[in-house]
């Protein structure tokens, strides 16, 4: 697929961002392109708003897979680009439009240049939430099309085009959404002694939560608790009877995640006693760590370097969350960062990755699959 075609597809997809499990236009756009290929070369199955695509090998004995996430974010785009989002309040601010386009470029190559083994492509919805990887793994499709290896990438705005970065073992952290509700007795601002102020309770809790990191977490380990939103109260002269907190937890080990959650729940119990209120802690969405398979990852890095397909760098662990971790929990494989050189980072309303990165990615994966699927 020519570079100009990749860019045109990416811009089409960029115009129609949709959030998790609502990617109806996106799915249809992808199907319209995929259905143009000969039926003897590819097989297509849909799953909710996602798609499975099998590119048939000439004498298959195994199956290599590639996953591309397809959802967008609830962000009002501020790029001013001529192909900016046509859906107010939504934007491809995490590069999934490029991820999909790269997958299409790889598919196009192998439809026209068959290899021995089957290739499976997963267009996965809802990576940003509520999480599409884990339920997609339960699909009946993967009972008949079972990967022997699975791969994925994610754009990295901070890396130059022509660069990839990854490592064996832990790449991305365990992540969990955090929601806390505090319910007490409201009242008149002039009579605080007759009420239980949930704004004060929430404020106290937020500061206490940081002690879980500073005093309960091994200094040689890493963990993060971020409270991103607090809502409570209805007017300036009414003591709030309810407070709602939302945030995230990120850790580099499952053991740390269990410890952090246990301490959060203990601190909430303390708030219940101290402020005569009721507290509720929930974790709406939890993502397993991305843990690259040793051996396969080094082999991939060496292959890309030896064939000068990209500048290969060794990555550091990141506190980023990615539900591709569930796929790596089930199948061997790896994920890597793709340099996309943007002055604005992921989840930013002005993210504008360099489209030349797509050609690098297609060349890397075409080269890798051409060797290891033959």
UniProtKB/Swiss-Prot annotation:
Pfam families in the record: M20_dimer (PF07687), Peptidase_M20 (PF01546)
List this protein's GO terms for biological process: diaminopimelate biosynthetic process; lysine biosynthetic process via diaminopimelate
User: Superkingdom, according to UniProt?
Assistant: Bacteria
Q: Hey, which pathway is this one from? A: Amino-acid biosynthesis; L-lysine biosynthesis via DAP pathway; LL-2,6-diaminopimelate from (S)-tetrahydrodipicolinate (acetylase route): step 3/3
Write out the catalytic residues in the record.
Answer: 69, 128
* InterPro entries reported in the protein's UniProt record: AcetylDAP_deacetylase, Amidohydrolase, Bact_exopeptidase_dim_dom, Peptidase_M20, Peptidase_M20_dimer
Q: What is its EC number?
A: 3.5.1.47
The protein's matches in CDD domains, at most eight in alphabetical order, are given as: M20_Acy1_YkuR-like
Tell me one GO molecular function of this protein: N-acetyldiaminopimelate deacetylase activity
As recorded in UniProt, coiled-coil segments are none
> What is catalyzed by this enzyme?
N-acetyl-(2S,6S)-2,6-diaminopimelate + H2O = (2S,6S)-2,6-diaminopimelate + acetate
Record's keyword annotation contains Amino-acid biosynthesis: yes
What keywords is this UniProt entry annotated with?
Amino-acid biosynthesis, Diaminopimelate biosynthesis, Hydrolase, Lysine biosynthesis
The protein's role, per its UniProt record: Catalyzes the conversion of N-acetyl-diaminopimelate to diaminopimelate and acetate.
Name the family.
Belongs to the peptidase M20A family. N-acetyldiaminopimelate deacetylase subfamily.
NCBIfam families, alphabetized: amidohydrolases
Q: What's the protein called, per UniProt?
A: N-acetyldiaminopimelate deacetylase
Q: Which organism is it from?
A: Bacillus velezensis (strain DSM 23117 / BGSC 10A6 / LMG 26770 / FZB42)
